[in-house]
Amino acid sequence: MSRFSQVFLSLKPSRFKNEIKGIVGYWPKDLSLYKLALRHSSAYPFRKKKGERNNERLEYLGDAVIDLVVAEALFYRFPKEDEGYLTKLRSKLVSRNNLNRVADELGLPNLLVANLKGNHGDSIYGDALEALVGAVY
């Protein structure tokens, strides 16, 4: 189990709730979606059954939400720009590097349950951010 998994699993529910409140700005009623959002598929590498619970589905939802919110903001912020400009700007704003940076600034690496010994690329924290956005949505 990774250091991050140990930190996450050792958090008391009240402390975890405080951490989530600090990130999302409100007191969550049900922590289960937030815990799921911070559970990477690598945390349980031998459990690959269909329907296994990890953050991938929330990541999918959060990715779409982030794209929509950023697209709408750019649409109204730059009313004279064409679709190509808006698409390029959105791509830069929601790039993996930016999502990883935001996730790091929010402290998500300290809450993520993951086995970091494997090769998961550099997207694991940005993916967790997307999953957290999916949980909020």
Predicted regions, residues:
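RNase III-family endoribonuclease catalytic core
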Residues: S2-Y137
